[in-house]
Structure formats: structure tokens, C-alpha cells
Amino acid sequence: MNLTSFSDTNILYFFFRFFLLIVVLINVKKISKTNKVENILKFWPTILSYTLVSGLRWGRPYDYNVYYYVYNDIVSGYGRTDNEPLFTLLVKIAGAMGCDWQGFVIFMSFVLITSGCYFLKSYPQYLTLSLPLFCLSLTFAENVMRWYLGYSFVLIGLSFLMLKNDYKKFIVFSLLGFFIHYGLLINIILLLLICLIRKPLNPRVAFIIYVCVLLFFSMSVFSQLANVVSKINIGTRFLSYQENAQMWLDADMQQSTGQTGLFTFVENLFFFYGGYKLCSKSPKFIKMYNIAVIACIFYPIAMQLELLIRINSVLYMFKYIVMGFLLKDILLNKSYYPKYYLNLVVVFCIYYFYSLVFHDAFMIGSEHYFIWDADGRKTLGL
């Protein structure tokens, strides 16, 4: 990390992330004293803080600039006719209300954090670490905004599936998400299949598969699919994806970010076994744990391709949620876990502060612009 590359925007972004962390910690301190949270309004400090920190960004990441034109085309009636209907409807309603693109960015940030708080409100005693980790881990959502806007509805539906096995409400909310972004169909199917697993995944088996993926998986298998995908007739809506299949499915044509460090390796090992112990004591976490384990195993593969990153990222968020549950449970039930687990709580808290607050703010080559940096510009340029 090059310390000389820090700019005013990096420093300001760091303080905003730190401010968000403090607000969320204060908020959950009050909420965690109750056994059940009936009203989502109790999360208003978290919702407001995240909405402002995320929603007031400008020109970043890439999709912010692309969707500025998509949004205005739809509002003016010049947009493509085969856009997802619910996304088009939301944009047209926002446009009719006089909302510009920046206002819609704020709206999407609000919907995402509200859905997350709605999902987590049923676990008030475990929110101390899980809600801060959830909020701080949503950085990638800023790059694939429409994907996460749709997933916000899927997440609300998932809360009914987790707590009450209510598949009807899950399907209804998932359809809302699907009609915002058709690509979520894969996530919806995966979530349904994973939630059918009634037992926590064996940590030893999970770890062995994870190691095999790290050591032996070759991305060339996806490159071979490119020619096949480009020849399948699945309608004009996906024509651009098919035409660019080689780009989406060939790791050599993208920047590879799929390196897994030693600490991440140790972290996943701890998560597999610690999460399994948590689920053995509290079965209500089994579905979330299984989603997170599969996301961890798939992570080294997914990080090689943007399309797979999108699919895996909304599953990977459950690692942070369940890890927050696990670390909190270790503090609440010290005698249930090995003694060294308590020391690891401190280690992981420091690590997450570094990786999600400090490192995210000061990555090389990243300028974290906000609306006051626009200087009259509508976008950063493409």
C-alpha cells in the first residue's frame, strides 16, 4: 500500500466509514437489549447514516456513470423497450416525482440498507457485530446497483423463509427482485436449493472442497463455454451478454482479482468449524451458515469473472452476517467454545476494521468522490 497516494477524498471516505461504524455500534447497543424488534424504525440511525454515506457518492464506481444515461433515457421515454418492467416502473415514478439520477442513487441505498435491517431485526441479541459487518461489507453493491436493488427484495423474502419456512412470501418478493434484474434468477434458484438442506454442512468436507478449489480448479472450463453461450437463442434481452460471452466467461480478458491470502484461508477454516458449532447449538442459523459456506467455497472461482462475482457477492454477505453472530455468541457463551476462540474474536475484530474501514478507504487508484466533488459534471466520464 502506497501511503503517498492518499488524497483528501480517501481521508474523507475513511472518516465517513468510521462514522458509519460508530453510529451502527451505538444503534445496536440499544437494540440488542431487547428480545425482539417489532419496528424497523428502531434502526433509523443505521438506515439514515448508510443512506447518506452510500447515496451521496458521485461518479463511482463505473456503473454510476453508465446508469446516469440509462436512467435519463427511461425517464425521457427513449430507453430500450425490453428493460426489466419493475425497474422501469420505479425509474418512471421517480422521474415523474422530479427525482434526478442522484436522488435515485440515494433511494437505492435506502432500500438496500432497509432490507438488510429488516432481515436482521429478528436477531437483536446478535446484532452487535453482524449489523456493522453487514453495513461495511456492501461496498460492491455500489458497483452493481441494480443487481442489489433487486436483491433487496429477495433478502426481505428470505427473512420469511429463514424464520417461518414461508416459501410463498419468498417467491413473491423474489419475483419483485427478478423483475428489477433478470440475472437474479440464478441467485433465487441457488437460495431455494441451499435452504432445502436441513443440516449444517460438514466443516471438514467443506474445508477439503475449498482447498481443492484453491489448488486444482482451472478457469479454462468457463472459456470453453463462451462459444456455446454465444450460439444459444435466448431472446434479444440477453443479446448483448451473448455477444460479449467471451469477455464474461474468459478470465484472461478480465482483471483477475481472485487471490486468496493466508489470513482469508485461516478465517474460512475458523468460520467453517466455528459456524458449525454455532449451528449445532442454534439451528436457526443453519440456512444462513450453509449459504455462507457455499459462497466461501465458490469465492476463489467467482473472483476471476465479473459475472460470477455478481452472483456470489449476494451470497457472500452471509459470511459477514454469520461471522458476526458467531463472534457475538463466543462472547456470550465462552464455556461452549475452545478457549482460544475468545482470543480470535479480538483478532478478527481488528482485521475487519482494517479490511472494511481502513483498506477500503485507502486502496491504490481509488478516488472516493461525493456530490460536492462534481463541479457541475453529471458523470465522471467513461
Question: Language-model features: where?
Answer:
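Alpha-helical transmembrane segments and terminal signal-anchor/GPI-anchor hydrophobic tails
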Residues: 41, 60, 65-69, 74, ...
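Signature aromatic-anchored transmembrane alpha helix within multi-pass, membrane-resident enzymes
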Residues: 207-212, 332-354
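Hydrophobic/aromatic-rich transmembrane helices and adjacent perimembrane loops
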Residues: 309-326
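Membrane-interface alpha helices of multi-pass inner-membrane proteins
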Residues: 137-139, 169-193, 296-300
